[in-house]
């Protein structure tokens, strides 16, 4: 945000995700990696075709009376940061003059490794995808727009809607 960046395109994850436009979020650092990993293993055990329970934080309920589970749920709720989701003006699949940043993580391009989607979809994620197929994205940049389309490599079908950021000139 401070550097007037509109989109952050990243890789090296084993599932695709595209965020909503995010603006002014805060970072929570009160959970150790070991604690998180232990609880995440339970959450990740979603089987071959995991389905999203509900979009978080609505799904963060008292799933368990276990103290460790409750701490994990409290941590998840703390990082959902609904206030960081920018309300944007849209025109079709394009957001118009957003102030925030889009974060997109490409899925596996090599097909060598995949991760199952966790059943608790994060509040800040607009779309995610994982069907154990490599993907690729086509990014078109013009003077005032950025457009992203992402496809499966096995049949070239889109895995997400076209997403564009359009900025007024000037």
Put a short name on every predicted segment.
Residues 141, 165-167:
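Generic beta-strand structural signal
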Residues 149-159:
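Short, solvent-exposed aromatic-acidic interface loops
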């Amino acid at each position: 945000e401070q550097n007037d960046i509109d989109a952050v395109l990243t890789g090296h994850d084993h599932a695709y995700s595209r965020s909503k436009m995010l603006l002014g979020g805060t970072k929570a650092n009160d959970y150790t990696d070991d604690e998180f990993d232990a609880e995440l293993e339970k959450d990740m055990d979603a089987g071959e075709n995991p389905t999203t329970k509900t979009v978080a934080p609505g799904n963060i309920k008292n799933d368990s009376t276990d103290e460790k589970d409750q701490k994990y749920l409290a941590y998840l709720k703390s990082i959902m940061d609904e206030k960081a989701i920018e309300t944007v003006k849209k025109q079709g699949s394009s957001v118009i003059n957003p102030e925030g940043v889009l974060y997109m993580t490409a899925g596996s391009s090599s097909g060598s490794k995949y991760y199952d989607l966790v059943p608790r979809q994060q509040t800040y994620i607009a779309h995610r995808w994982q069907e154990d197929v490599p993907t690729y994205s086509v990014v078109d940049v013009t003077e005032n727009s950025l457009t992203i389309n992402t496809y499966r490599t096995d049949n070239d079908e889109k895995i997400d809607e076209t997403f564009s950021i359009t900025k007024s000139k000037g």
